[in-house]
Amino acid sequence: MESLVTLYQEHIKTLQQRAQQVLARHSLDAMLIHSGELLTVFLDDHTYPFKVNPQFKAWVPVTQVPNCWLWIDGVNKPKLWFYSPVDYWHDVEPLPQSFWTGEIDIVPLKNADDIARLLPTQRQNVAYIGPVPARATQLGFNTEAINPPGVIDFLHYHRAYKTGYELYCLRQAQVIAVTGHRAAKEAFKSRLSEFDINVAYLSATGHRDTDVPYGNIIALNEHAAVLHYTKLDQQPPEKRRSFLIDAGAEYQGYAADLTRSYAASEGSDYAQLIKDMNKEELELIATMKTGVRYTEYHQQMHYRIASLLLKHQLVNGLTAEAMVKENLTGPFMPHGIGHSLGLQVHDVAGFMQDDRGTHLAAPQQYPYLRCTRVLEPGMVLTIEPGIYFIDSLLAPWRAGKFSQYFDWAKIDELKAYGGIRIEDNVVIHKNSVENMTRDLHLA
């Protein structure tokens, strides 16, 4: 395997080529990419946890340091002004010395405001890429040069194609997340509360709750019916029935996003539903290949969901085709089959069909699908089918013309389990699909 240094060198070479293309297209001399700034809580002297600009960490794995700047012209070595003040109140990151620093010209920035005099004076044909437009204005950028849509679209579109370095980071994020998932499963078996299961996960991954790429979903019993449940009860339920964990990790700025569902009793109907869903999810992934639009796999999964509902007699008397046509599967799986994954959990440009920003929306029947791209080598996506028992979504069907086909007694019994979601992270290769999650034997 190539060394991390070599992988990063090739990564920077690719980013420099992309920079040359986008700068030439928009008649620009350079991009100034801002890591971001700390945001102060209203009427307080505390700040919110820092979240770095994703376009910044695409170039350098600096994720915890505000007030940093990158000057990119596509030709010369990228220049990084690294914020390293004299400060006895807070921890200060030293100037980095790592696998990546040989490819970057690093200059210390002692005072955040010094950047105004350190930047090249000629900024007329430079684009500011960052989260603080007011700072860009102070530095003399006009409105058209602040996050210009054409530049952003180009950068976003090409982020779908991961470099070898990015794939390495994504695989490492998987390793960390899988470690956490195994610890969380053991905590569930030990009858711990949602709060304590989350503590076990964070401890195993070495993350703080502000470091994980998204808020961990640790849902026991009926809480699994809340798609983004993040409350974390501090007391365990009187009776354990189910556990849904949707939790990720981050490595050098790249995310993992994994979900598993577990039954407290292996002999329950719910446990069998998990096994059958797991089988359908793996079979769907086995069909994935380049040249097929991601939307197709979402639609295929709805046919598989229909078959599961029929097999478990939650719906009766209809064909799978009729169920999908009439959207009877919709209330059971109300979200998309997945999304792009990378520097962000819901990575950008899922609807973008070219690097000029052409948009293809999700089908009207499936408005929450987050990706309509045609699969190509280098893309990384999640596959995360689910079946849930959500009162607000099932209520119209209970009163509707298809009500007779639902076994409401069985559905009501399963409501106490909340739902099921199983999520793997996959890489599209030219002639194969790599399941990063299953390669680490997370059942």
Curated annotation (Swiss-Prot):
Its cofactor is Mn(2+). One of its GO terms (molecular function) is proline dipeptidase activity. It comes from the Bacteria. GO terms for cellular component: cytosol. Keywords: Dipeptidase, Hydrolase, Manganese, Metal-binding, Metalloprotease, Protease. SUPFAM superfamilies: Creatinase/aminopeptidase. Its EC number is 3.4.13.9. One of its GO terms (biological process) is proteolysis. It catalyses: Xaa-L-Pro dipeptide + H2O = an L-alpha-amino acid + L-proline. Binds 2 manganese ions per subunit. Mn(2+) 1 binds at residues 257, 339, 384, 423. Splits dipeptides with a prolyl residue in the C-terminal position. HAMAP family: X_Pro_dipeptid. Belongs to the peptidase M24B family. Bacterial-type prolidase subfamily. This is Xaa-Pro dipeptidase. The gene is pepQ.
